[in-house]
From Swiss-Prot:
Pfam families: Ribosomal_S7. This is Small ribosomal subunit protein uS7. It comes from Salmonella typhimurium (strain LT2 / SGSC1412 / ATCC 700720). The keyword RNA-binding applies. Part of the 30S ribosomal subunit. Contacts proteins S9 and S11. Binds EngA (AC Q9XCI8). The keyword RNA-binding applies. InterPro entries: Ribosomal_uS7 (IPR000235), Ribosomal_uS7_bac/org-type (IPR005717), Ribosomal_uS7_CS (IPR020606), Ribosomal_uS7_dom (IPR023798), Ribosomal_uS7_dom_sf (IPR036823). One of its GO terms (cellular component) is ribosome. GO terms for molecular function: mRNA binding; rRNA binding; structural constituent of ribosome; tRNA binding. Keywords: Ribonucleoprotein, Ribosomal protein, RNA-binding, rRNA-binding, tRNA-binding. One of its GO terms (biological process) is ribosomal small subunit assembly. One of the primary rRNA binding proteins, it binds directly to 16S rRNA where it nucleates assembly of the head domain of the 30S subunit. Is located at the subunit interface close to the decoding center, probably blocks exit of the E-site tRNA.
Length: 156
């Protein structure tokens, strides 16, 4: 770790259609091999489908789905005197969003629907309804943290 100074977060440009930095980050996470326009069209198509299903605006529906997947606590390995403990720690807000988006994209990629846009729309729809693989992942992480609550005093 460098000792000179803390490097700040890079500013990312908001997405062109909705002007949301969160959505731009989501597009970047979905993007494969630098094909941003493909990733954008997949995300916008999925959001359109999601908005039709939920009856909310695209951005609002996306925000609800993301909120249901965001983890509040996670476990980190900490070595204390020869044994490794899984210590529960609170997740920083930026990391919460990053993890939630990553989990949604991973879950969508594992689904068996026809197109990626449909898979993403279905996963976001499930997340908005508090079900689906991404929500299950969050619950597993929370369960691990709850199970290891006894080691919380090893926090650093």
């Amino acid at each position: 770790m460098p000792r000179r100074r803390v490097i700040g977060q890079r500013k990312i440009l908001p997405d062109p259609k909705f002007g949301s930095e969160l959505l731009a980050k989501f597009v970047n996470i979905l993007m494969v091999d630098g094909k941003k326009s493909t990733a954008e069209s997949i995300v916008y198509s999925a959001l359109e489908t999601l908005a039709q299903r939920s009856g909310k605006s695209e951005l609002e529906a996306f925000e609800v789905a993301l909120e249901n997947v965001r983890p509040t606590v996670e476990v980190k390995s900490r070595r204390v005197g020869g044994s490794t403990y899984q210590v529960p720690v609170e997740v920083r807000p930026v990391r919460r969003n990053a993890l939630a988006m990553r989990w949604i994209v991973e879950a969508a990629r594992k689904r068996g629907d026809k197109s990626m846009a449909l898979r993403l729309a279905n996963e976001l729809s499930d997340a908005a309804d508090n079900k689906g693989t991404a929500v299950k992942k969050r619950e597993d992480v929370h369960r691990m943290a709850e199970a290891n609550k006894a080691f919380a005093h090893y926090r650093w």
